[in-house]
Amino acid sequence: MMKGKGTEDDRPWQSYHTVYTTAKAGMELVDKEKVQRVVYEMSKGSKYFQNEERKEAFIKQKIDNLRIQCANLTQEDLAHYQKVADRRIVELEASRDLSRIWLHVDMDAFYAAVETLSNPTLKGKPMAVGSMSMLSTANYEARKFGVRAAMPGFIARKLCPELIFVPTDFKKYTYYSDLTRKVFGRYDPNFIAGSLDEAYLDITEVCRERNVKSEEIAQELRAGVYEETGLTCSAGVAPNRLLAKVCSDINKPNGQYVLPNDRMAVMTFVSSLPIRKIGGIGKVTEHILKGVFGINTCEQMLEKSSYICAFFSQSTADFFCSVGLGLGQTDSPQVRFRKSISSERTFSATKDEVLLHKKLEELAEMLSADMQKEGLSGRTLTLKLKTASFEVRTRAVTLQKYISSSEDILKHAKKLLQAELPISVRLIGLRVSQFNGDKCSAKSDPTQKTITNFITSGDVNRNCSSFPDVADHDFVSNAETDMSIDSRQTGQLDWRDPFDGNYLSDVDYQSCTVQKSDGVEEVSLSPLVLPYITGFRN
């Protein structure tokens, strides 16, 4: 008998979704099923794989519960929430600001490009920065095979046997990052550095003063970066930061895309834009929006606005509706304050206390250097540990005095670590918050009691960079890098996708930045849903 089309039973990898199978720039023609199969087969049976299975089962349960609640909504309920949604959409529309011009610049495969610049023999060959344990990034030649950042090197080698590995060199990347920032400063002295390899610039004034179009500034800036560094970058121009970020990815590498400051142009642009393209919507939120509400594009956020208002808190519903309208942050960051600063390191799992204390000392020194560079001192110190079984634990202490020296940070961090020993961990992180002079640092941000009480019952604040609104409403927070998880939550599952080894993505590894990789996605839920959603712990 002829065998029929494969099902999930004989092709289990088809239902296995990880960050490694999500396309990045340069991966448009990748055989996605092959990548899924390789990742599935090489991770099957590992602790990471078991963690993934728990995550999938958890989200499936939540999706099933939400579907039941959707089915129980009456026509009267929907009519009520539609009125709520319509009123809020009108209010959001009234806030639309088309007066600013934002440019997002993103270096092309930054770490890999820097290494190729240092060693021209790598040009045209598939290469990745990292090791057999974990990759930081991959060049565009390697991406054609499905190799990407955050992927274990041994999986990458399986996908691309010719792959060349180059060890990381952050001093080198920081040097070139500083060169790019000199160029950015010519166009906007108050630019927002999202990470080592990206930035947001308000080019409104420079366009007005020089009487030039935004595309000319984008072209000139990109040429300036190349002249200064020998590296290429891509740019996106739009009326707000959220859309500028999306636009910078359209013509990668070494290209640019300009979205006019026109309402109709914006609405047309977002009408067919996949929701996953939006900063703040990661894998889990995508699954929920698609699986429960049938929302695949930004435009459908408005079409399903009654359900959004019924099931999500006002801040989350506002974010989703804003996405449907193509709205985002347009204000200048000068008046905003940094709320936290952190450092973390990932390594092969170990219970060696001497090594753990050495890692802690290194983190304290890096954290202190960053704080003193910005003139910061803080009262709350948080320790984050990721165990060998991918469980994320956090412990925090609020001190009587403000601290900033590496000695003070290390002294209190050791006490927090000592309480957890003996333990085998693969990640250590330190975070300092509640800074001196920050009147609101101890208060919760109403937009940040966010996105999933699906995932955790604790209050989780958004990951803060030196400019805390880099990703606009970044409702999807990465538990791997978010040091602000409520210290009472000690059994959170890890929602990123690492194996053993270093996890180093194209982000500033020394400071707390808004990262776009998959993480815990916290969703504030309305009272309608909360009885059916419970936080979980191991």
PLM region descriptions:
Residues M1-L196, Y200, G324, S505, ...:
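Residues that scaffold, gate, or flank divalent-cation-dependent active/transport sites
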Residues V35-V38, G45, T268, K277, ...:
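DNA-contacting surface of Y-family translesion DNA polymerases
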Residues R87-E91, A112-E115, L221, L367-D370, ...:
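Eukaryotic intrinsically disordered and solvent-exposed regulatory patches
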Residues D106, G146, A156, D197, ...:
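A residue-level signal for conserved active-site and pocket-lining positions in enzyme catalytic cores
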Residues V114-L117, A138-E141, L243-N251, G291, ...:
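Short acidic, glycine/serine/threonine-rich loops at helix termini
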Residues S177-R186, N190-E228, T232:
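Hydrophobic alpha-helical hairpins/lids featuring a short glycine-rich hinge
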Residues G194-E198, A238-R241, L376-T380, V425-L427:
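Short Gly/Ser/Thr- and Asp/Glu-enriched loop/turn motifs at secondary-structure junctions
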Residues K213-K277:
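Long, highly charged, low-complexity intrinsically disordered interaction regions
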